[in-house]
Each structure stands twice: as C-alpha cells, then as structure tokens.
Amino acid sequence: MAGGEGGVTLGQPHLSRQDLATLDVTKLTPLSHEVISRQATINIGTIGHVAHGKSTVVKAISGVHTVRFKNELERNITIKLGYANAKIYKLDDPSCPRPECYRSCGSSTPDEFPTDIPGTKGNFKLVRHVSFVDCPGHDILMATMLNGAAVMDAALLLIAGNESCPQPQTSEHLAAIEIMKLKHILILQNKIDLVKESQAKEQYEQILAFVQGTVAEGAPIIPISAQLKYNIEVVCEYIVKKIPVPPRDFTSEPRLIVIRSFDVNKPGCEVDDLKGGVAGGSILKGVLKVGQEIEVRPGIVSKDSEGKLMCKPIFSKIVSLFAEHNDLQYAAPGGLIGVGTKIDPTLCRADRMVGQVLGAVGALPEIFTELEISYFLLRRLLGVRTEGDKKAAKVQKLSKNEVLMVNIGSLSTGGRVSAVKADLGKIVLTNPVCTEVGEKIALSRRVEKHWRLIGWGQIRRGVTIKPTVDDD
C-alpha cells in the first residue's frame, strides 16, 4: 500500500496522477478524471430475491466476486457488505453502434485502451467508475441502507426470468427502495437463457403490471444473462445514461463510517516493521487526504469505577489511502475506501473498529448513550411467509423495557426501550455511538430467534457523554 512521496501517487503509472500540492477540492466533481481513474464515485445497490443472481451480475460487470466470507453471520452484527468496483468505458468511434460501444472492466484497468471490435477504430475511454454494494439479505440491506452506512445513489432490481413475478420478497424489495427514497432504478430480468421467448415476454408483462404505481414505475427492464454475460453492455449503457451523477459534498470536513477494520501485520513481524491498523468504509462527505490528522469516535470505550461509560477518542494520522488495489492521495465519497493509519493494529484487528466514525480532528459529532427518537413501524414483518397465521407477521407495538437491535451508521448495538408514547421513544444504548440529531436509525426485534427489521426512526435528541482526553 505504498503511498506516494511528497503527496504524489507513484503506483500504477497507467492511472491518472493525483497530486496533493495542486488539489483544489472546490473544483472536484464525481466525474473528475483524476478521481474516477482510481476510485468509484457512484454507489449502486443490488437488490433481489435469494439466488436470483445478484452476485453473478456484479461479477459479470466488474469481474469481482463479492462473496468473500464464510463466517458471514457468526456474530449477528457484522454483516459484510460486498463492494465491487467497475469502470465503464465508451468507444469514441461514432460509427460503432450502441450498445457495443459500452464496456465494463475492473477498477485497475487503464483509463483508455484501443478498441478490439473488428471494423472500428479509436479508443475506449473511461466515463464512469461505479461501486456495487452487494448485500446478503434484504432486511440487512434495508437496515444498512436505512441507517446510511452506505450512500446509495441507485439500485439494480433483479428478477429471475425462470420464476413467476412477483416472488414473495420482491414486493418487500420495492418497499425497501421506497423507504430509501431511491429514485433511480434499473430492473434486470436475469437468467433469460433458461426460458423461451414467449415466457420472457409474459414475465415482462408481469413485471410491468407489478411495478405500476410503485417507485419503479417507468424503470427500464433489461433482459440479461449474467452467467453468459449477455446484454451486460446494455446495463453499462443504462448506468451511464439513466443514472444521473449524484451531487456530492467535497468541501465539508470529511467523515467516514467504518464498516471493516483489520490488522495487516503477519504474525512474527519485527517491531520496527509493524504497520498501523487499516479501517475500511464509505466516505459520506468531504475528502480525506494522505498525511491528514484524524480522530476516531467513540474510540476506546470503557467503564469507570461506578460503572459509567467512558469514551476516549483515538487520534491518528492517515499514512495511505486505497480503493480496491489502487493507491490514492485523496479519497472522495463513493465506493469502499481503505484508510491506512498509525493506530495500534490491535485496536483494528478483526473488525473491532466497525461502527466507529473517522474524520477530521474536532469536527466529528457528539457521542450518544441514550437516544430520543420519532419512529415508524412497518405494518408487517418482512420476509415472513404466513398464510394462515396473519397475526404472527404483524409488527407489535414497542413495549417498555424490551431490547431491540439498533443500527446507527455501521454500528449494530442493543438498545433498551426506556419510555414510549405514540410515535416517540427513548432508547438506552448498550454501546455509545457517534452520531447526530436528524440521522436515521433502523430498529430490529428478535422474532423466532432472528433479528427482523420492524421499523426505523429519526434521532430527535439524546444524552451525550463527554469524551475523555489524555493530558499529555
């Protein structure tokens, strides 16, 4: 993860150079060439029924397989989001018909390469760099998207062509998209190689009828086969043409939500060769730079002699930044960014920093131990198929003293409901969280041994604790 000397990226000479000396954040856009050469700036969620081919589609577009972890669900808290970045190119030869003039490649591909299509001339040029956020399950997806652990700009809704539409969860996915207020949706009719043309047409009509009156009404429906990579370039074209470039805030103080963290040192490493911990997450706003002093909140959490919670923020410095395998000198919102720091690696190993917020020193929000929220409950549980027993799927009201799982940013923590009336509730958190008034949180309840999403809330106010700082 070699950072450049003197604020210039030295790695990957085939990518655009980043120079901190000439960086002017006020001029950056999500399409600035020196940004999209090395990192993604648009996040696209993939939503769809289990085994309808979400990961396969992501792999077909980006070449990256997002399922990397066997123990995905072991601790019921860290649900690993799979991120995969893809560069989308367009051929600059006007005689080349669409959609063949669009192409997608992995994120370390050069920004320009000569055409290999017979009868065309010119180069494929980089037009977009997108990150696909591949979530394991839809209630997790909703919790993740709801609480803003990942900024979503658009969604791909997958429907398998060899099954009837709608499947039971598909309507919930649409509900999820509505709750998220995602405006830009592409519907992919996958596995088209497994059905006859008449079946595909019939299902196309079903999909049209199904999305009528929902947020997805009018969304393009693209027949594809992810396995055979059929029509993938059409998906690329629609991503470029139908998904507008989102407005991003590059000038505020930077803030990153940590969704992974690790210790990159091998066992038996010499003391002098130890590297600091690495945090991975998505930047919500602002630009992080190599060499910048940073603060991580809530930091190290402990209890004093009276059992009261104490937080000690971690102060450190960024030594390197990277997106997938690309070195960065500065990182903007979009995709998953790895931040190499000087933090003690034991604090970062095995995702210990998940749920923390990293940003500029003195610019991070308060640390809360209790929240007062206005909340909304879903009418029925997601993903529970109950034909006979309608009551089981209905979401019961919040009751005093029950324990919920609360997702705030990337932190999942227990929360005890200490008071509740109409649509307001007070929640005492098991772990302190760095957040601010107005942020959205997701609420889940234990139903038949599983955490199920039951609603979401918005922070009105809360009880904060003052972080302790060493006097050295």
Curated annotation (Swiss-Prot):
Organism field: Mus musculus
EC number: 3.6.5.3
Tissues where this protein is expressed: Widely expressed. In the brain, high mRNA levels are observed in specific regions, including the habenula, anterodorsal thalamic nucleus, hippocampus, hypothalamus, and cerebellum. Also expressed in the embryonic brain. There is a differential expression between males and females, which is tissue-specific. Females tend to have higher expression levels than males in the brain (cortex, hippocampus and paraventricular nucleus, but not in the habenula), as well as in other tissues. The up-regulation observed in females at the mRNA level may be due to the presence of 2 active copies of the gene.
Keywords for this protein: Acetylation, Cytoplasm, GTP-binding, Hydrolase, Initiation factor, Nucleotide-binding, Phosphoprotein, Protein biosynthesis
Protein name: Eukaryotic translation initiation factor 2 subunit 3, X-linked
UniProt region (G1), positions on chain: 48-55
Gene: Eif2s3x
PTM sites of type N-acetylalanine: A2
Record region (G3): 134-137
A Pfam family annotated for this UniProt entry: GTP_EFTU_D2
